[in-house]
């Protein structure tokens, strides 16, 4: 009965996000440390960022130093369907290995880790200064593409994207 009541208390409690939404390069370190007595620093945030993974647009996390990744079912069900056969339905029956050699690879899926964030707001905003309409859009698109190309420097191992925040109030180049 005690476990049931404890569980009910967890369900009934409210989650508060007093610090709001934040990105890895804009986390309110001092505010959180002061309020909660934590000792978060940039090195800790970098480790958390390096554990965060993006798979085909889904969020995921490394859960081992061996590269094991945990994500949501809907993010990998397509892979399970592709790997299934009439004899082995991985969606219905699941799959577990005894060792790494027996693991299955999801064809066409790539795990991306965010390795760098650069604020490019000034550069993006300057590219459209004094322009309107199609000319404005073309200039912004050209500048965004140039930033992405420069950041990845032609290295096919990386995926660089300029991300817009706050309805165009801030831009960051994310390198995965």
Where are these regions (language model features)?
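N-terminal export leaders
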Residues: 1-3
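Terminal presequence/propeptide segments associated with secretion/organelle targeting
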Residues: 7-176
């Amino acid at each position: 009965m005690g476990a049931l009541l404890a569980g009910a208390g967890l369900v009934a409690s409210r989650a508060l996000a007093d610090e709001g939404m934040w990105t890895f390069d804009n986390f309110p370190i001092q505010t959180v440390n002061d309020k909660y007595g934590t000792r978060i620093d940039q090195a800790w945030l970098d480790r958390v960022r390096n554990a965060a993974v993006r798979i085909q647009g889904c969020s995921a996390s490394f859960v081992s130093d061996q590269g094991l990744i945990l994500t949501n079912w809907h993010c990998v069900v397509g892979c399970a369907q592709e790997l299934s056969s009439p004899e082995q339905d991985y969606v219905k029956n699941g799959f577990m290995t005894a060792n790494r050699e027996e693991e299955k690879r999801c064809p066409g899926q790539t795990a991306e880790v965010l390795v760098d964030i650069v604020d490019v707001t000034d550069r993006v905003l300057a590219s459209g200064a004094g322009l309107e309409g199609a000319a404005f859009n073309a200039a912004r698109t050209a500048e965004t593409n140039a930033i992405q190309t420069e950041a990845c420097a032609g290295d096919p191992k990386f995926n660089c994207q300029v991300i817009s925040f706050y309805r165009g109030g801030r831009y960051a180049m994310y390198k995965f």
